[in-house]
Design a protein with these regions (language model features):
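Membrane-interface loop-to-helix entry segments
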Residues: 87-91, 142-153
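Membrane-interface helix caps and helix-loop-helix hairpins in membrane proteins
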Residues: 75-85, 104-109, 130-142
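Hydrophobic core of alpha-helical transmembrane segments in multi-pass integral membrane proteins
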Residues: 29-47, 65-70, 181-185, 224-237
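Aromatic-anchored segments of alpha-helical transmembrane domains
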Residues: 64-74, 118-130, 177-187
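Membrane-interface transmembrane-helix boundary segments in multi-pass integral membrane proteins
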Residues: 17-34, 178, 191-231
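Alpha-helical transmembrane segments in multipass membrane proteins, preferentially the mid-helix core
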Residues: 40-44, 99, 150-169
């Protein structure tokens, strides 16, 4: 079987020493720059569309996300490599469904979830990917890159369309995440999976730092202060912009 069809687990077994690129290497930064350019171009294009065009664009985004997820399941199953880890219960995978719901409703809560969770989650995945042992021309590598680009793009499109984040909706977002974490935590124990990164650091440098601070069994406690810092930088500029707008309108 060609390496194009290997999953990460298969590559680890057959070629454990293979590394396509190191984090923040020239290759990694070049590919990331291409992804940023694609997202920026999509935002500009979306901003210029009328309301009907924007709705169609979001439908297309949802269709691409679903197709991307199905591509992973169909090809991994067809090659006998499907595993429970592929169930769409990772934080980014769950946001695929949030994107689909948002494309039909475009309500403030799902938009906030996408901004608060999808942006940092997908950005971290692209900046510090957990699949550097897969070749670029590999179906799982293509899926991992494309799905995270689409997930990062979705909330950026909402911003280009006029959505403005509001930190006052964050308690609801956090409550939803915590409610999801409880069943996922126990499901990880039953299936030996790592949904929400609650059952291991998966080689992620950020999670390794948390493990060094809080211990390998309690690293996930560090998610709370880490998320608080990330949200501060994500929301404070919008808060200042809103205050400035309120002053100028008086």
């Amino acid at each position: 079987m060609s390496e194009f069809w290997y999953t990460k687990a298969t590559m680890n077994k057959l070629n454990p020493d293979y590394i396509r690129f190191e984090h923040f290497s020239p290759t990694h930064l070049f590919v990331t720059a291409i992804f940023i350019a694609i997202i920026a171009a999509a935002m500009i294009f979306y901003h210029k569309l009328d309301e009907k065009g924007r709705q169609k664009f979001l439908y297309i985004m949802s269709a691409l996300l679903i197709a991307d997820e199905l591509w992973k399941h169909i090809l991994s199953a067809a090659t006998g490599q499907w595993e429970w880890e592929f169930v769409p219960l990772h934080l980014c995978s769950i946001n695929i469904f949030v994107c689909v719901i948002n494309s039909f409703k475009r309500d403030k809560l799902t938009s906030e979830i996408l901004y608060a969770l999808c942006v940092p989650g997908a950005a971290l995945a692209l900046l510090m990917p957990t699949w550097p042992n897969l070749p670029f021309l590999n179906f799982m590598s293509i899926h991992s890159n494309s799905v995270h680009v689409l997930l990062l793009m979705s909330p950026r499109l909402l911003l280009a369309g006029g959505f403005r984040p509001d930190f006052r909706r964050l308690p609801k977002v956090l409550a939803i995440v915590l409610c999801e974490c409880v069943p996922v935590f126990f499901l990880n124990k039953v299936l030996d999976t790592n949904f929400f990164f609650l059952n291991g650091t998966a080689g992620n440098p950020v999670l390794k730092i948390l493990a060094s601070i809080f211990g390998k069994d309690f690293y996930f406690i560090g998610f709370i202060p880490l998320l608080a810092v990330v949200w501060f930088f994500m929301y404070f500029p919008w808060y200042l912009a809103k205050k400035k707008k309120a002053k100028t309108s008086v």
